[in-house]
Amino acid sequence: MPTYRLNTLAVAVAFAFSAPSIVNAEEAPAQAAKNIEQISVLGSRVSNRTSTESSSPIDLIDADDLTKGGFTELGQSLQATAPSFNFSRTQVSDGSDLFRPATLRGLQPDQTLVLVNGKRRHNQSIFGLNGTVGAGAAGTDMNAIPLTALKGVEVLRDGAAAQYGSDAIAGVINLSLNNSTGITTGFVQYGGTSEGDGDTISAGLNRGFDIGSEGGFINLSLEYRDADGTNRAERDTGGSLDVEPGTLSEDVRWGQGNSESEFTSLFYNMALPMGDGELYSFGGYSERTALGNGFYRNFNEASKNVTQVYSDGFLPRIYNEAQDISVALGFKGDINTDWNYDVSAVYGENQYDFTSRNTLNASYAAEYLFNNPGASDADIAENSGPSGGYSGGFRFDQTTVNLDVNGIVDIGRGEPLYVTVGAEYRKENYEIVPGDEASYACGLANMDTSYPSVNDPDQFAQCGFQAYNGLRPEAANDSDRNSYAVYVDVETMITDAWNVSGALRYEDFSDAGDDLIGKLATRYEFSDDFAVRGAVSTGFRAPSLQQSGYTAFTTNLGSDGTLTQSFTANTGTAFPSALGVDSLELETSTNYSAGFVYDVTSELSLTVDFYRVEIEDRITLGSLLTADDVSFSSEAVAALQATGAVQANYFSNSVDSTTQGVDIIASYRTEVEGGNLGVTFAGNLNDTKIDGVNAEDGIPEAVAFDDLQRSFFTDGQPSERATLTFDYERDAYTSTLRFNYFGETDVKYFGNDHIELATDGSFKATSTVESAVLVDLNVSYQINDMFALSVGADNVFDETPDELGDDEVLNAITNGAFKYPVRALPYGFDGRTYYAKVSFSF
């Protein structure tokens, strides 16, 4: 049965005046003047609305603003220009060093919808689990799209699921691809940190070609980036732990910093007039690799190391590879003078693979020695198994077919009723690929048998590769689903000063049910200089296949050599079903926003927008449960025992929350000393509260949603963000000075399944990154019509998080080697970076 969450009055009004809200642009730095008549793509199906005619807030950021400064990734550029956008720099978190969690307004990565040229983009195949912002949420890989390919970005800061479908709870980001022709542009950039590492070379090339004489074109973009890693680790001193003599090193053996990485991409955008219509297509391919670090294994950690292989211990490495491909094909044209259509199909695929390097499976050598007592060191080393191999991967693909019909209806007033009706079909597939046997096996025979370690018979050797234990065959999965949607948008001017718009959408998912949602938005202009706006909407996010289909098995080694299994059960299997979780349901939301637009003078403009987002049934991954934890259900105990595991967890719709805040943007432009000065302040305040935990009967709230998860939801992202940007242009010179403010983050180290490092409470329970202001400076000189030179520094004053104290858990875990926190890092710890860039255009 459909669920209807709109009251009768709202439905009636929505149907009468409904259409997506026209989004008014709060221009990014230096944009206020030149974008006065820029058409907004997001939030409205009406093609002739400008950015000054809005009912919901949107940031318009053009390519020039994205490429100011030394940032080479889209995520970093957006964070510097749109304060409601966060791009956390989590470290030592498996795949999150390639897939940074990108969020709006402090919500989850999968609660923001990303479009390319107005069409839905696919999500990434992987999500973070290892203590990260956005844990368990598969968002969109923002860095798969090169800056060279973009004409601009629009950030809609309002709930828009009724307009665009699932995921658009926090807002929508639309990436507009370059459509220029007849000009070649490009750049070469080199940079590095003031510590002497992180050397990065980037190069990009864009060229557009005319096709035929009727306005057809194809635009091609190529980009490459090669970055050395950074390392802020120090010599391990023992920290707060007692260590064996000889384990301390005079050298830095640990790794804490950005991964060594490489990025290659090729994108295209094309259109070809055909008769009364236009054939269009766009898409691209990108590949990124990164070589990250695990925790250092000391030589005397007998359960993890084999000294015949690594006499001084070893630093296991994780080689991550991400491949992304997308292609869109569509045709749009006129039905008559008042109506037009747009039909399209979009395919996108994301792959992520883990390969372990400089590692070992300690149980291989242990089994060999067990079966060959007295074996020589050389024989043990020779029979210790591989030092690396494939540890598994993830696949996700999505096909979206869409039809829009847009037109106008004369309703007897000066302005007609703008109408859009549409339908959408989507097909998704998710796959988990197991790793090589050595990556997870217990012994050469892989019989789930433990063996005394090679170097200490009183300890037992761990199974699988160190750092990233491989995905087991039991975790292999291949699942799919489909959905369809129908929607209607209408919009009109009630008076010359009053715009009303809204949307209705019905969507049905084969695995998660259906919903009818809507949006109402309005804008009233009291004068040419002052207008108020507001919106109310309902929305939803369907559980991703990555959540419902995710399974993982882990082999745990007890001190007595006992091997036990823990696993994450996917939706619909016996264990979660026995506890009442047969399937994941839709996350549902209600969004409220209200604000104003005020042109104080011809040079100064101000926008303020308040918002409130209420979300029910947010999906989280619960804590591991043992048979004792579920003893109230004999069915659950039996289901757990049938798997051979001693503990398990699963995703469920466990949390209700409210996020509220305000966005403030002020822009000022004037002439100073013969040049143009632009000053832009952009700030975001947000606060997330947990309203309730929907634990299954018999499961304590603290287990269903533990302190670790709670802290990431409420304090894992800055609740205050702001930028103050000064742009000055005079003759051939352009300079940009930007102040970036990041509020504090403070998250727990562990949840219920914690590591006991001390029993006297001497260790700090949380990881804190204090508030900070980072300053960026860029100066550019237009050498001639063809070449421009830019030099600058990001984080000029070398701001980093406070160093870890002796009472920090991470300090103890790493024997004092880690200098900075690794979780909930809004701005990282690499410090100051320098760069020089040569741009060309001909």
Question: Model-found features: residue ranges?
Answer:
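N-terminal Sec signal peptide and the immediately downstream disordered periplasmic leader
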Residues: 2-71, 75-79, 142-145, 203-210, ...
